């Protein structure tokens, strides 16, 4: 998987057409009303639903006030620069309530749980689970067969563009509510304890804990048993 360069992301955000999409439930004498070039209308008789940009739909509503009896607007963003990722073709399990922005790469058989937030440029490897309410900041990169625990934060780096992103290598387990700061690499097979704040690189096959996190031991058989990644949870 290719990590997006920070300057690519900055350019994308700068040049994107900012969007305020809305869904409008509307009723009245709607025949012949032009809701704008961005709009998609699903109207039967004197009622229906219109999808499109608020600027266009608002102008149509104001110009046809005498024809419109009532309307309700659903809106969840304003001048948004980055759309959400189209999930329909992703070969992964993605649960309701996950927020995943465009230009995120998700490997096959990954699992994204409810409430996870994944920012532009992040990369998630095959078979990796992102648990509930975890946050992957911009350009955060997670390898294969990892588990990022509930509420964990992998800090993002888009600004400044020279900053090094968080890198989580393969087979890593990050405990609940742990925080991995910018520029940190967590080595292959390592375990980060719940609640740890990691401010420096973690060697492969070690366990770190505490604030700030420190190596407390090498991975042993007991640790492997307690932190086993279950492939059964990743089957589609």
Swiss-Prot record:
What SUPFAM superfamilies does the entry give?
Answer: Trimeric LpxA-like enzymes
- Which pathway does the UniProt entry assign to this protein? Amino-acid biosynthesis; L-lysine biosynthesis via DAP pathway; LL-2,6-diaminopimelate from (S)-tetrahydrodipicolinate (acetylase route): step 1/3
* The protein, known as: 2,3,4,5-tetrahydropyridine-2,6-dicarboxylate N-acetyltransferase
This entry's Gene Ontology molecular function terms read:
tetrahydrodipicolinate N-acetyltransferase activity
Please describe what this protein does.
Answer: Catalyzes the transfer of an acetyl group from acetyl-CoA to tetrahydrodipicolinate.
Which UniProt keywords are listed?
Acyltransferase, Amino-acid biosynthesis, Diaminopimelate biosynthesis, Lysine biosynthesis, Repeat, Transferase
- Read off the InterPro entries from this record: DapH, DapH_N, Hexapep, Hexapep_transf_CS, Trans_hexapeptide_repeat, Trimer_LpxA-like_sf
Q: Which GO terms describe its biological process?
A: diaminopimelate biosynthetic process; lysine biosynthetic process via diaminopimelate
Family membership: Belongs to the transferase hexapeptide repeat family. DapH subfamily.
Q: Where is the organism placed in the taxonomic lineage, from the top?
A: Bacteria, Bacillati, Bacillota, Bacilli, Bacillales
What organism does the record attribute this protein to? Answer: Geobacillus thermodenitrificans (strain NG80-2)
Name the Enzyme Commission number(s) assigned to this protein.
2.3.1.89
- What reaction does this enzyme carry out catalytically? (S)-2,3,4,5-tetrahydrodipicolinate + acetyl-CoA + H2O = L-2-acetamido-6-oxoheptanedioate + CoA
What gene does the UniProt entry assign to this protein? dapH
């Amino acid at each position: 998987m290719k990590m997006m360069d920070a300057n690519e992301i900055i350019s994308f955000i700068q040049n994107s057409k900012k969007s305020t999409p809305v869904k409008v439930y509307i009723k009245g004498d709607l025949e012949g009303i032009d809701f704008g070039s961005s709009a998609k209308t699903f109207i039967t008789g004197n009622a229906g639903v219109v999808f499109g940009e608020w600027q266009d739909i608002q102008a149509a509503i104001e110009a046809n006030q005498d024809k419109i009896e009532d309307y309700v607007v659903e809106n969840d963003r304003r001048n948004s620069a980055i759309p959400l990722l189209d999930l329909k073709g992703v070969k992964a399990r993605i649960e309701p309530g996950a927020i995943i922005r465009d230009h995120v790469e998700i490997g096959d058989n990954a699992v994204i749980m409810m409430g996870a937030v994944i920012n532009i440029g992040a990369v998630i490897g095959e078979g990796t689970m992102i648990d509930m309410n975890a946050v992957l900041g911009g350009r955060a990169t997670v390898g294969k067969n990892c588990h990022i625990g509930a509420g964990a934060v992998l800090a993002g780096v888009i600004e400044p563009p020279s900053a090094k992103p968080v890198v989580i290598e393969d087979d890593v387990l990050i405990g609940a509510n742990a925080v991995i700061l910018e520029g940190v690499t967590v080595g292959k097979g390592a375990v980060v304890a719940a609640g740890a704040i990691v401010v420096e690189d973690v060697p492969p096959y070690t366990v770190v804990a505490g604030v700030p996190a420190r190596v407390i031991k090498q991975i042993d058989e007991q640790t492997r048993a307690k932190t086993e990644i279950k492939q059964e949870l990743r089957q589609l």
